[in-house]
Amino acid sequence: MTMLKDPSKKYRAFPTIDLPDRTWPSKTIDAAPIWCSSDLRDGNQSLIEPMDAAKKLRFWKTLVSVGVKEIEASFPSASQTDFDFVRTLIEDGHIPDDTTIQVLTQAREDLIARTFESLRGAKKAIVHLYNATSPSFRRIVFNQDKAGVKEIAVNAAKLFVKYAAQQPETQWTFEYSPETFSATELEFAKEVCDAVIEVWNPTPENKVILNLPATVEVATPNIYADQIEWFGRNITRRDSVLISLHTHNDRGTGVAATELGLMAGADRVEGCLFGNGERTGNVDLVTVALNLYTQGIDPELDFSDIDGVRKVVEECNQIPVHPRHPYVGDLVHTAFSGSHQDAIRKGFTQQKDGELWEVPYLPIDPADIGRSYEAVIRVNSQSGKGGITYLLEQEYGISLPRRMQIEFSQVVQGETDRLGLEMSAQQIHSLLRREYLQANTPYALISHKLQEENGNSAVDAEVHVDGETQHWRGKGKGALEALVAGLPVAVEIMDYNEHAIGSGTTAKAAAYIELRVNGERAVHGVGIDENITTASFRALFSALNRSLSQTQAKAA
């Protein structure tokens, strides 16, 4: 079977919502929603190998540590394992006073009774009821009409009231999900929710949660936002209701749907860390939270050690986080492209503490989420001078002059092309040493003596040449001019730069020379030494030897 030439024969577009006076497009998100993690329930049930009790507890503690205040821990009536985990959390004191455990149940009395039993002794708890309401589920799965589906919800809601009354020591919050909400007729979804509200009788001080799932993502995010805004306008007793979003990622727009849903008036978000969940996953709470953070809004979740959180999630879920996953992937703060690297390097150079973050290509400062800058710029065959320069500056304190950046980038390019691999900062530094600092043939500087008198300098350089030692002597206005005067070839110095590497007693001097020998093409040399004069002499010999070697190779 192949893709259809006319897919309209098999698929149809989801109908739009008649909401000409919609207001959400002009709204902005200015505060964090209530966050609810479903990692231990929705996420766990989607795993090939569900978590054992130890992994669940480790995950729970991680969620608490980052600041998630509502955590859906399990489906207690589904298995003894899930039931026991809820009991462990309650009996062993793993639920902080500012954190609320949430559990899920279907709309059957035996399951509801078992669910409430699992929560005995909890200080506070959210009990989450659901039943599917969309036409396809009514027709295909349950063979129920609208009245039957509504009756299921209402009867279960009454059972919630009954069993909660038997445990008055717990502060209860009720949650209802018209499962497959986004594929349900809006009027009917409202009708069912209104009926549940009537039973639960919420108040502004004791609200109910109406969770509106995109159980399967079936339309563009703007349609989901229209559904949320319409629902918020029309639901009864809106001041006593928290509207919760629960999006999935079947069309790849779970985050967008959630953000537009918040703009449309929702109060709460359910999802999973890094987007685990059924099929293509639930909405990624981390991405939504850090999207807020990069807009200057406190997400009220702390991902200062995002790699530590990722480690727990990967080990518990046994699913790796994609290297391109927003904010946390191995490569998301990495630039290989030369132009990108150059822009990032310039951005870091100009960025000052306390100022607005404006580094190109980096929407967030990696340091804010515990990332180092080491992986921001990496060098391969696509890289340019900016990335190479940045790595040498950051790792070794070597600041190449601009024209030398261009020359050395060509050396690195040749090496990456030859190897076909990425080069680390250490490999780049080794290449710099081999190409410049170890360029000691045909002339190797052994030592030098410098005398200065009346503004003039005299140099006596001891040089190793073809197995013998020679003394080159010259005079000039400065040390370099004197050395050039004593050379056996004609040298024209085009540019000279120097800077310190490090500070204090361990500081060294780095010197860079651009010169032309016998009128040939200009080349660069590098010298590093504790003494600045020695460093400059070594840089001159580096450039001299490189020029002569290139001329010899060209002649051959």
Swiss-Prot record:
GO terms for molecular function: 2-isopropylmalate synthase activity; acetyl-CoA C-acetyltransferase activity; magnesium ion binding. It is found in: Cytoplasm. The keyword Metal-binding applies. Gene3D superfamilies: 3.30.160.270, Aldolase class I. Its main location: cytoplasm. GO terms for cellular component: cytoplasm. Its EC number is 2.3.3.13. Coiled coil: none annotated. Its cofactor is Mg(2+). The keyword Nucleus does not apply. Mg(2+) binds at D42, H246, H248, N282. Keywords: Amino-acid biosynthesis, Branched-chain amino acid biosynthesis, Cytoplasm, Leucine biosynthesis, Magnesium, Metal-binding, Transferase. It catalyses: 3-methyl-2-oxobutanoate + acetyl-CoA + H2O = (2S)-2-isopropylmalate + CoA + H(+). Pathway: Amino-acid biosynthesis; L-leucine biosynthesis; L-leucine from 3-methyl-2-oxobutanoate: step 1/4. Homodimer. Catalyzes the condensation of the acetyl group of acetyl-CoA with 3-methyl-2-oxobutanoate (2-ketoisovalerate) to form 3-carboxy-3-hydroxy-4-methylpentanoate (2-isopropylmalate). This is 2-isopropylmalate synthase. The gene is leuA.
